[in-house]
């Protein structure tokens, strides 16, 4: 009887030890997952806090490939959101390889998006376009993921536009416009309409009325929500358009609105050019000269300085 009780006690102790070990292992893994998920939840509102949390996690303590991939993705994302320029893609490739193998479409798309952003920051725009396009292909037909789709449309559209691929840019912006309307995302809608207006502007005089309609629609929506961050670039685009049409009074009106909405009015050299051109167009040559001369003090902005010099020579 005593031996049986002793044997039972040993078995119970052994079982408790095994359960404790399993619980410790599970708790350790869960803790790290919880930390990663918490960092992810902070990414939009407090990216600096998310970065601090992620930097405090040692990869040696991440016991699974899933955790290491998630950490690699989040750390790359946090650096991007904190405007830290990244030149080494070895970290994000950890995430890309894992999610490609496990075919997790939303996380695949996210990994390729931040891989593309790394190329973008290195001014490798063709590489960025390639990665962004792959990212979009993973979630194009999936419901949801609106925020990531919006970011992809915005970046792809802008890169196509800067590369002179206006047809591709406008196609992407059309999709962005539909998404923004469906999500009632007025900020993205204003940006998209304004960018489509800029594309129309570059297509020549016959497209100026279309450009005006798109930009004024963006302005109307933006004014309804009184967001200066949205309105300022629209004012800039409209002033450029009216300078070309030409409609001198409106060109000057929107150039002034653009200038008054800026936080930095000491180094806004492109706005100085906008104002200089608008004042010149209105025959106010002294005012034009004041703003154009400001541009010549810039250390960079060589194209803007060249345009200012051409206008001053007139």
Place the predicted regions along the sequence by residue.
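A "functional boundary" signal
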Residues: 15, 26-314
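Bacterial N-terminal signal peptides
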Residues: 14-22
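Bacterial N-terminal signal peptides that target proteins for export
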Residues: 2-14
């Amino acid at each position: 009887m005593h031996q049986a009780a002793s044997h039972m006690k040993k078995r119970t102790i052994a079982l408790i030890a095994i359960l404790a070990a399993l619980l410790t292992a599970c708790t350790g893994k869960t803790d790290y997952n919880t930390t990663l998920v918490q960092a992810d939840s902070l990414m939009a509102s407090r990216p600096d806090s998310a970065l601090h949390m992620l930097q405090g996690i040692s990869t040696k303590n991440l016991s699974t490939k899933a955790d290491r991939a998630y950490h690699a993705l989040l750390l790359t994302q946090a650096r991007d959101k904190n405007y830290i320029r990244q030149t080494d893609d070895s970290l994000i490739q950890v995430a890309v390889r894992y999610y490609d193998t496990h075919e997790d479409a939303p996380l695949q798309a996210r990994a390729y998006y931040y891989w593309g952003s790394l190329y973008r920051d290195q001014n490798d725009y063709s590489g960025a376009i390639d990665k962004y396009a792959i990212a979009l292909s993973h979630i194009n037909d999936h419901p949801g993921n609106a925020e990531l789709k919006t970011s992809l449309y915005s970046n792809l559209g802008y890169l196509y536009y800067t590369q002179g691929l206006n047809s591709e840019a406008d196609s992407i912006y059309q999709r962005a416009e539909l998404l923004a309307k469906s999500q009632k995302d007025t900020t993205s809608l204003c940006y998209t309409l304004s960018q489509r207006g800029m594309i129309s502007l570059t297509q020549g005089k016959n497209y100026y009325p279309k450009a005006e309609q798109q930009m004024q629609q963006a302005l109307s929506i933006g004014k309804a929500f009184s967001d200066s961050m949205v309105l300022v670039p629209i004012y800039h685009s409209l002033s450029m358009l009216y300078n070309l049409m030409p409609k001198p009074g409106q060109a000057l009106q929107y150039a002034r609105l653009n200038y008054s909405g800026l936080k930095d009015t000491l180094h806004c050299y492109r706005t100085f050019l906008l104002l200089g051109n608008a004042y010149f167009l209105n025959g106010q040559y002294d005012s034009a000269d004041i703003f154009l001369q400001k541009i010549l003090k810039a250390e960079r902005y060589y194209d803007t300085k060249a345009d200012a010099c051409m206008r001053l020579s007139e």
